[in-house]
Curated annotation (Swiss-Prot):
Family matches, as InterPro entries: FAS1_dom_sf, FAS1_domain, Plant_FLA
Induction of the gene: Down-regulated by abscisic acid (ABA).
Glycosylation site list: N27, N128, N162, N189, N273
Gene3D superfamilies registered for this protein in UniProt: FAS1 domain
Protein name, UniProt field: Fasciclin-like arabinogalactan protein 8
Propiece span(s): 393-420
Keywords associated with the record: Cell membrane, Glycoprotein, GPI-anchor, Lipoprotein, Membrane, Proteoglycan, Repeat, Signal
Organ and tissue specificity: Expressed mainly in flowers and to a lesser extent in leaves and roots.
Signal peptide: 1-25
Amino acid sequence: MAASQTFSLLAFTFSLLAFASTVSSHNITQILADSPDYSSFNSYLSQTKLADEINSRTTITVLVLNNGAMSALAGKHPLSVIKSALSLLVLLDYYDPQKLHKISKGTTLSTTLYQTTGNAPGNLGFVNITDLKGGKVGFGSAASGSKLDSSYTKSVKQIPYNISILEIDAPIIAPGVLTAPAPSASLSNITGLLEKAGCKTFANLLVSSGVLKTYESAVEKGLTVFAPSDEAFKAEGVPDLTKLTQAEVVSLLEYHALAEYKPKGSLKTNKNNISTLATNGAGKFDLTTSTSGDEVILHTGVAPSRLADTVLDATPVVIFTVDNVLLPAELFGKSKSPSPAPAPEPVTAPTPSPADAPSPTAASPPAPPTDESPESAPSDSPTGSANSKSANAAVGVSTPSLFTALVTIAAIAVSVSLCS
């Protein structure tokens, strides 16, 4: 009887494990790689780094444009404007074909990635989705007076409740997005933006040291700036900059910038060491990143610093404020780890008396190492109408933390069975 119960429990446990392992991450670039019709759209997702933002999120819908529709959009506008337009095609909700054709009351507004940029006044960051006659679905800006100028054409790929990719026949145009001038990243504009963002000390140091010109020389190919606030320079533990040599000040300021465009989404998905403008050799003056929820933490080897706000995001330039001065280990030494406690003196334990029966508990095996804790998907997920040929490459399957608990249950069940 006990053996039968144990077998049933084990079967149930491993069924749960099989279900849990179906939870997937996604890679939009790889999903679209096998669809030549979207090669232009896919390329612009990479150029604008929107691909990283999409990959860092779940419960998301991407409205893709074929090469013809994408060419009409991209041929007339700078990259920063294209990024804004494409951000309107990324919905922060999951819409598969079934849900799309069964919208409550026939119409709804959906939040887009553009809404999260802080550049969308009013409801410009929302999209109107409306079910039309004949089974058609229309899309348009949520701005007052906007028309449904875009229509759903077909499904491309679904990873249920994680990401849905749908094709539409035209871009969704929000008033003012395509006509907005591209933000400037000139010398005067950078310092002005920094001062307005509460980073006057940092801006003054860039000018007085001449490092601002180094920043300017990197603008064309890509520049990411981490600007400490004025309060950050007053914080306890920040060294007296007047005691640094000119070369050390230059290295410190160059350490606060990257010679590449790396917006927040790219920093969130980063797994490698990041070179800075101060990097002069392998492993020198670099940074690493980690995430906590939606926050990005920069690590220098001395002390962490949190990404606070986005001052400017104008491809290929992005400027962030950070809440601590970035202190490179090459100048200020690595943070000291606490000394290990002395080992306790060995104690001779008394001889235990024999037990009447073996213990019904067993130690659970350690959880397998993992970089992230993926979320589980609902069990009633619908099936997508089209699948990518490279599903294994585009979908990263990882085991959730539930694994440990389930294996523990199985181990206890086996132990109980043996004791019975």
